[in-house]
């Protein structure tokens, strides 16, 4: 996955803006893409506040040591979820790394919704998926 995304980053950043999403794995993508080249002015990394606040991840320092791109984060407010499984993310029990933060940031930028409304939609979808057969 890392070589593939690094290659995509090299090409895509020449023609459009790119938000890398995938938590700490994207630091590895940046490191590899640095050798192939990419347009730093069109790249940002998007993640959740859980990854930013994870002292074991050390994402901000890692990214800074590789590239001078912006790192954006979103607090999905999962601690306020109706569902214990989602609340586990906010305590650090569950780790993501699937692009959740970048996806949430893109959704907020595209629709203009806030994190409270986003949580309502997340809870609604979680309920739908967890109760469907």
Where are the model-predicted features located?
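N-terminal loops that bind phosphate or other acidic moieties
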Residues: 1-133
